[in-house]
Amino acid sequence: RDLVRSRGLGDVYKRQGNGQAEGKADMKNLLGGKGANLAEMNLIGVPVPPGFTITTEVCTEYNEMGQEKVVALLKGEVESAIARVEELMSSKFGDIENPLLVSVRSGARASMPGMMDTILNLGLNDEVVEGLTRKTGNARFAWDSYRRFVQMYGDVVLGMKPTNKEDIDPFEAIIEEVKHAKGVKLDNELEVEDLKELVKKFKAAVKEQTGKDFPACAYEQLWGAVCAVFNSWMNERAILYRKMESIPDEWGTAVNVQAMVFGNMGETSATGVCFSRDAGTGEDLFNGEYLINAQGEDVVAGIRTPQQITK
């Protein structure tokens, strides 16, 4: 039985073919909502970054068998799937000179509060960030991506994000401290040296709070993120929501791993959220908003005012 379903050109068994994907839209039970729809988008010719989906069945087995056994069973399939993404992106996961970075997202059958937040830019470390700088000629982009990754990974995988509104996110406190010292108001006003300082302070906070160094190995980072998705299925908030909505625990969640596409490379890149229908009326009206030189959750986080995609 396949535990990993690939998207992009070909599948986990490296079959070739433009616009091919193992999954499709009606496979939400196995691939989750995101995984099934990403596969369908690929099949109809939408340019979707290559990646793969670890199925919902693995989540169930993870909760029954435990982390160690499931990771051992999955290891070969995931490494094979990563190798296929490397081939398609002409880059290598964890490589210093030509790095492949990925995103990791949860993907239940239906959107569900309490599930793991997205992790972007996975695969960076102190050496890879220098390689990314050389590869792109853009030091600010490389270090901005790195500081975002350490914060996301620390918050989500290492459990450093506050669970209530009274507690302060240690990473946000550091950002505010550095911005105040620099005399700026916005994150995108920070310069390369400021971003390097953020990374250094972020990693020190990780060491202080967890007692361990921030993981430098790309595969260690990946397995940490994958297991965090599965663990989030059984967290208190997710369990409570499932009880309220009569969603069985056995459904599980899928994990989606995709090659990164960057919105923070400068004034010619952006991140956005869009809808094919009006959310209030259902009218066939394309709408959404975007932020230039930003990434991920910036659009909905209220850091800067986004622009309307239809203007």
Please place each PLM-identified region on the residue numbering.
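Single conserved hydrophobic/aromatic residue that forms the stacking wall/gate
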Residues: 1-13
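Nucleotide/phosphate-binding sheet-loop regions of phosphoryl- and nucleotidyl-transfer enzymes
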Residues: 11-311
